Amino acid sequence: MTRILRDIWLFFWRDLSIARTYRTVFVFEAIEALFGAAMFYYVARFVDTPGLQSALPQGGSYFAFSLVGFVFLDYLNAALDTYDRSLEEARDSGTLEHLLVTQTSLPVFVAGSAIYPFVATTLRIVVYVAWAAILFHFPLSNANWLSVFAVLLVTLLAFSGLGILSASYLLIFKRGNPAKWFFLGISSVAGGMLFPVSILPDWLQLVARFNPVTYALEAMRAALLGDASVAELWRPIAILLLFAVVLLPVSMFTFAWSLRRTKITGTLTHS
């Protein structure tokens, strides 16, 4: 266990060291977060009505509802891109083959590659919410932070399975991933990101029930805007854990199979 944690830490420290050489990126991302929060605030002022507020979960403002949806889109993007990007960088730099012939296990390689991008995404989202709270009155007084952390953890587990599947596709086909963009498109419509799932046609509501994004957003909005406890959120948390229990083993098996296939065909390092 100590060796596993040390290896994961080394992956994280490597990525952090690389990121620290591009310090101006952090400044521009903070400015980008300010513009993003401002955009959602003024769009919400344009469309907010008492009728709309009553239709939203927790009866809050559209600004709070849409901002939570937008930052979760950032998490979904991170989950789907992180493993792809780490795999491409390791393959292009020639370190992938070296890693695979060492004692570094596949789960450690996958987890280590993901930890820094997820930490960076979390910090970026904290900046978004901070700007929104300081300048645009985003409501944080009803937040249950223990529930927020619990929902975030199970969401990352569920989303990671999707990201590893995406990386498996990249290993085999090398370029492009239409399945990833299809899932992002479906989630943006049938995931409850910018409007409630309840207003969708019945068939799209059915699609939403099979989408982990739906349950992640339901739970996060209840925890962040409605002071919901972990016990009160047992249903969406349990569903997200079920997604994780199914997707993580399947995705790891698929990723391992993809690696074996590329080794056999000799295309592991080919773009």
Task: Pin down the residues of each PLM region.
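Hydrophobic transmembrane alpha-helices and immediately adjacent juxtamembrane helices
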Residues: 1-271
